[in-house]
């Protein structure tokens, strides 16, 4: 193989642990965060001060969870541990101390994979990016075009304090966006004399106006200032000095009400160059005076003072699981505090114990609410391992305390220079969330303050020092350095070769000689996220298409026989490993036993380590999770080695699709507008066949008329339909079921009124009591079929927790194999997506000079305008690799090896491939990368040579089977009486405003009238129309739509006398066709039409 091939493989770097951000945060919560909250919360004293309850936070303990992870999933339980904490109740009068360990609630635990199991479902807590607490200076233009400056002091929790200037050079302050108050009034209220303030300022002359203004208003003393403050903050209440003092203290100086947090204190000290100790979390006089001083320096335009950019990553921080959970625990503890105080006051002082005071309910409720319904607690995307990994590394600006979609402007969503190496500039959703949801870059990590850091190698005198550990820098620190990108060319000793190097310095790009460079990036892929780093030749793709490529890889369905890409980037194995989908041995040793369900590794000391494999389990997205061993008995394994492949993995690497032979050429218009023409080989050889597992569930409930019963005895059902049911009436495992088949037989008792007339007649004649039950069985829905994989039965006797009112729950899992078909969506890794338009027999497909038919024909017009040329590089590199019988790893951004390196490498590979025996035809130097194909139908060659090669193509989760839908009659909405929408409701197709315009433009009046009445909400008309169709009569004239009547009624309810009149001025009664008993069924059926109507006139 040529030297370029070796270089291609050399640049692969190992990434840090990719789920670290989740695990480290939860570990911090257990070791520090929870203890911190319990300590802040204690002691609690009652209103008289006699009793004190202390929580000894560092002595909290967690009990072993009741169920392990797998058991919790099976039982629909939460994988959680009980929290106990030691409490001390001190009676101040008697000196008596009672100590007791008290249960304070259940805490869901994180699994090894960084997820939580809540009610049996795997969930992920997404990281949130919020504005960091601290002090921010910004400028605004007033209505006269004059620039004014303001300073905001933002705490972690508590009131915002804003200082601003006006055109008269007066300083004002606002508390929580209320009315503005003269800044000196606040200074006096805080007990500072004029001299105290003036001494601290570098330019007191600017501040003199504010002092004079306060004196003019007659506010000369602390008491008057407190009164004024109270008047402004609590208008309408009688002001008092003590009230003012209490208000000021509670707003800014009470640690329970005001908290800057560790980060806020760190940021304020850094910005204002203070040395206030780290544990002072409230505002100090020094903070306020320094803020005013800095603001005056900005006004006077004196060096050293700078404005803040709120979108800079130095001013935004990440809140991960631990911190979000800590905030929730604080909410729960505050609710608990009120309860404890009440109980202390009400209870008998002598007999009270800590356990009687502490009620775990508020804390449990707060934690449950967080995991169950917070915007940041999300149902994990388990479509494939990459989707799972990306979900755990997602960073959202939405959620409580963050932004809302509507309010977020362009600036927040935009890529900021400080994102470099921290947040991926490419991977973000399309649509309303663009830029608000980001992904962490590959090498980024979150530091103790919540700021994102990225690693660099140090550069000394033009030499890159790769010894030891890299240096991690946050965005603030990096701004002060000159940083070169990761693809800078160096010689073998690490000296930078070029004379001028492009560097980033203070968010600008400039070129400097090598000796001025401070740091070099670790790797070329450190700028982008994990999903984006799996795209080969990424640097040749337009960013919009790379974004689609990143997002679509997460939607690839795991296939039956996955195949790793011929052309990869070298990160595939790390993604598979860190996603948690592949079992990994933690010891060195030998494999002593292997079967489909478990692998046993014997370590060097003779101890056995068991690894149980997942077999055909259903994921959150109904795809199939299955693990297959890749080691044999007797194999030597080392710690960290992969033992088995998970779904969408092969050989320990992620394998989302198949390598297929692709030709870029038009074919009879079947690949017009991104459509895809595929060969029948894809279907027959199961290349794109995937397994999907559906879950069906039924409850037997206690009803007013008696219990529902799960049974085989179902009324009016043939014996044939019950063939596959066991004696309990539950389907047997392994049975093949189609739509409408019974999965679980269930009968419900029915009341007298439910009986049809013939049954009443029978009972009247014979006194015969037919079984008073109704068939309510669980059946396979329309369009579904498959094989029963598993049946689970839950009853109270077995100790299962059932929903209230249920006696028994049965769950049936049905697996189906879905082959690829017309209408399925496929995509490459470069954002080149399309829908299958036709499946052609392989003998009709265009074929290569050696007779091989191609697998897929794509439209060449999909490449130039979209500028994702990476797909062509991948195609040709794959073609060369397939002919050389090897796989290639190409790290993106390869210009460090020379200009146009991708081009040269691909060409060298193709030349190498054509030198193999019998492969001369593979590469034609006259027309590089193209071959003359022949038409499979005629055997004639096509006019022009065609680009052919191997590319990695994915089948996406948007399958036509899940989307195709039709309706004849079905359910109607109760109010508007229009058909419902959507496949799940068996709904109709919406005919919207624009479609009505189109029909109006054509003048298709009758079609339009029919669509708006009979086919929609003319209740009487549609029943008559159905009747007419059944009897073969002409369809009668449509009536009035129900929604028009609803509109009339709504206008009348506003008190408007509104009616409908004919041309002659006669009022039309819209309600005349309504039966007084209103017994028109919501779903017209043949029975409801009444037998009399069928008789011929």
Swiss-Prot record:
* Record-level GO cellular component terms: DNA-directed RNA polymerase complex
Q: Which PANTHER family match?
A: DNA-DIRECTED RNA POLYMERASE I SUBUNIT 2 (PTHR20856)
User: Which keywords does this Swiss-Prot/TrEMBL entry list?
Assistant: DNA-directed RNA polymerase, Nucleotidyltransferase, Transcription, Transferase
Check the record and name the InterPro entries matching this protein: DNA-dir_RNA_pol_bsu_ext_1_sf, DNA-dir_RNA_pol_bsu_external_1, DNA-dir_RNA_pol_su2, DNA-dir_RNAP_su2_dom, DNA-dir_RNAP_su2_hyb_sf, RNA_pol_bsu_bac, RNA_pol_bsu_CS, RNA_pol_bsu_protrusion
| Function per UniProt | DNA-dependent RNA polymerase catalyzes the transcription of DNA into RNA using the four ribonucleoside triphosphates as substrates.
Keyword field contains Nucleotidyltransferase = yes
Enumerate the HAMAP family for this protein.
RNApol_bact_RpoB
Q: Which family does it belong to?
A: Belongs to the RNA polymerase beta chain family.
Q: Is Transmembrane one of the keywords UniProt gives this record? A: no
Q: Name one Pfam family in it.
A: RNA_pol_Rpb2_6
Self-association and partners: In cyanobacteria the RNAP catalytic core is composed of 2 alpha, 1 beta, 1 beta', 1 gamma and 1 omega subunit. When a sigma factor is associated with the core the holoenzyme is formed, which can initiate transcription.
Q: Which GO terms describe its molecular function?
A: DNA binding; DNA-directed RNA polymerase activity; ribonucleoside binding
Instruction: Please give a single GO biological process term from the UniProt record.
Output: DNA-templated transcription
Residue ranges annotated as compositionally biased, kind Polar residues, are 1077-1091
Its recorded reaction(s) are: RNA(n) + a ribonucleoside 5'-triphosphate = RNA(n+1) + diphosphate
Superkingdom of the source? Bacteria
Q: What is this protein called?
A: DNA-directed RNA polymerase subunit beta
Write down the EC number: 2.7.7.6
Q: Where is this region: Disordered?
A: 1072-1097
């Amino acid at each position: 193989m040529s030297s370029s091939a070796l270089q291609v493989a050399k640049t692969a770097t190992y990434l840090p642990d990719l789920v670290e951000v989740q695990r480290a945060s939860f570990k911090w919560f257990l070791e520090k965060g929870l203890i911190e909250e319990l300590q802040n919360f204690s002691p609690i004293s009652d209103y008289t001060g006699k009793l004190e309850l202390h929580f000894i936070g560092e002595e909290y303990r967690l009990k072993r969870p009741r169920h392990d992870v797998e058991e919790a999933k099976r039982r629909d339980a939460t994988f959680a541990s009980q929290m106990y904490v030691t409490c001390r109740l001190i009676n101040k009068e008697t000196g008596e101390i009672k100590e007791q360990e008290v249960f304070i609630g259940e805490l869901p635990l994180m699994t090894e994979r960084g997820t939580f199991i809540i009610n049996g479902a795997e969930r992920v807590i997404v990281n949130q990016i919020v504005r960091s607490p601290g002090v921010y200076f910004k400028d605004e233009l007033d209505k006269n075009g004059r620039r004014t400056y303001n300073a905001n002091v933002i705490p972690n929790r508590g009131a915002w304090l804003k200082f601003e200037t006006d055109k008269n050079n007066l300083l004002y302050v606002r508390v929580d966006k209320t009315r503005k108050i003269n800044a000196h009034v606040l200074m006096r209220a805080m007990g500072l004399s004029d001299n105290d303030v003036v001494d601290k300022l570098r330019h007191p002359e600017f501040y003199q106006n504010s002092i004079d203004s306060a004196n003019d208003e007659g506010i000369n003393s602390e008491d008057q200032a407190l009164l004024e403050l109270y008047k402004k903050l609590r208008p309408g209440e009688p002001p008092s000095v003590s009230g003012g003092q209490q208000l000021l203290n509670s707003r800014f100086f009470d640690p329970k009400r005001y908290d800057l947090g560790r980060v806020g204190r760190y940021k304020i000290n850094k910005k204002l160059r203070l040395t206030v100790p780290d544990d002072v979390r409230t505002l100090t006089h020094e903070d306020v005076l320094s803020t005013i001083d800095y603001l005056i320096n900005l006004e006077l335009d004196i060096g050293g003072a700078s404005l803040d950019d709120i979108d800079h990553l130095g001013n935004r921080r990440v809140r991960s699981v631990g911190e979000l959970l800590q905030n929730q625990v604080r909410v729960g503890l505050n609710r608990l505090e009120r309860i404890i105080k009440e109980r202390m006051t009400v209870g008998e002082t002598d007999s009270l114990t800590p356990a009687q005071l502490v009620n775990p309910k508020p804390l449990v409720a707060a934690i449950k609410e967080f995991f169950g319904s917070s915007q940041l607690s999300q149902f994990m995307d388990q479509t494939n391992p990459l989707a799972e990994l990306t979900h755990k590394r997602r960073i959202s600006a939405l959620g409580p305390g963050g932004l809302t979609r509507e309010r977020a402007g362009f600036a927040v969503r935009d890529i900021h220079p400080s994102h470099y190496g921290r947040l991926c500039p490419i991977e973000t959703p399309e649509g309303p969330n663009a830029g608000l949801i980001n992904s962490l870059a590959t090498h980024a990590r979150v530091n103790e303050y919540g700021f994102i850091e990225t690693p660099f190698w140090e550069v000394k005198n033009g030499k890159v020092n790769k010894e030891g550990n890299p240096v991690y820098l946050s965005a603030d620190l990096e701004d002060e350095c000159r940083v070169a990108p990761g693809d800078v060319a160096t010689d073998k000793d690490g000296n930078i070769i070029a004379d001028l190097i492009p560097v980033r310095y203070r968010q600008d790009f400039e070129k400097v000689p090598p000796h001025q460079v401070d740091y070099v990036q670790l790797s070329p892929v450190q700028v982008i996220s994990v999903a984006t780093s799996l795209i080969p030749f990424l640097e040749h793709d337009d960013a919009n298409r790379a974004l689609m490529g990143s997002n679509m890889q997460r939607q690839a369905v795991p296939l039956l026989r996955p195949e790793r890409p011929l052309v990869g980037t070298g990160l595939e194995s790390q993604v598979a490993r860190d996603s948690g989908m592949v079992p990994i041995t933690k010891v060195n040793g030998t494999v002593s036993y292997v079967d489909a369900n478990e692998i046993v590794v014997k370590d060097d000391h003779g101890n056995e380590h068991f690894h149980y494999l997942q077999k055909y389990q259903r994921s959150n997205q109904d795809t199939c999770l299955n693990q297959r061993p890749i080691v044999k008995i007797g194999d030597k394994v080392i710690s960290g080695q992969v033992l088995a492949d998970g779904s969408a993995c092969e050989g320990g690497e992620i394998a989302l699709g198949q390598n297929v032979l692709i030709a870029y050429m038009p074919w009879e218009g079947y690949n017009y507008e991104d459509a895809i023409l595929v060969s029948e080989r894809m279907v027959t050889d199961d290349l794109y066949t995937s397994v999907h597992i559906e879950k069906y569930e039924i409850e037997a409930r206690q009803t007013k008329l008696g219990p529902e019963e799960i049974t085989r005895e179902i009324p009016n059902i043939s014996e044939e339909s019950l063939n596959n049911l066991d004696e309990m009436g539950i389907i047997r495992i392994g049975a093949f079921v189609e739509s409408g088949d019974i999965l679980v037989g269930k009968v419900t008792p029915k009341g007298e009124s439910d009986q049809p007339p013939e049954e009443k007649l029978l009972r009247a004649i014979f006194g015969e009591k037919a079984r008073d039950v109704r068939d309510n069985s669980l059946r396979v829905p329309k369009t579904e079929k498959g094989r029963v994989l598993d049946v689970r039965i839950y009853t109270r006797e077995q100790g299962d927790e059932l929903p209230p009112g249920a006696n028994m729950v049965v769950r049936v899992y049905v697996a189906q194999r879905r082959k690829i078909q017309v209408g399925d969506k496929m995509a490459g890794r470069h954002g080149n997506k399309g829908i299958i338009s036709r499946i052609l027999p392989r003998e009709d497909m265009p074929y290569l000079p050696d007779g091989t038919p191609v697998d897929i024909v794509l439209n060449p017009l999909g490449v130039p305008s979209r500028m994702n040329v990476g797909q062509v590089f991948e195609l040709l590199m794959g073609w060369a690799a397939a002919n050389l019988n090897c796989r290639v790893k190409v790290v993106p951004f390869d210009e460090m090896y020379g200009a146009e390196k991708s081009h040269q490498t691909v060409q060298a590979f193709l030349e190498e491939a054509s030198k193999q025996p019998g492969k001369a035809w593979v590469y034609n130097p006259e027309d590089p990368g193209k071959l003359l194909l022949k038409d499979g139908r005629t055997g004639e060659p096509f006019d022009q040579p065609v680009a052919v090669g191997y590319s990695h193509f994915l089948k996406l989760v948007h399958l036509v089977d899940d989307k195709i839908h039709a309706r004849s009659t079905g359910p109607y909405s109760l109010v508007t009486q229009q058909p419902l929408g959507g496949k799940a409701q068996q709904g109709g197709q919406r005919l919207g405003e624009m479609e009505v315009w189109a029909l109006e433009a054509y003048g298709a009046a009758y079609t339009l009238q029919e669509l708006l009445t009979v086919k929609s909400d003319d209740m009487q008309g549609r029943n008559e129309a159905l009747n007419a169709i059944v009897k073969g009569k002409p369809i009668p004239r449509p009536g009035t739509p129900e929604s028009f009547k609803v509109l009339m009624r709504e206008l009348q309810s506003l008190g408007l006398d509104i009616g409908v009149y004919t041309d002659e001025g006669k009022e039309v009664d819209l309600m005349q066709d309504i039966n007084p008993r209103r017994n028109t069924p919501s779903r017209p059926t043949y029975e409801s039409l009444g037998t009399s109507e069928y008789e011929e006139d």
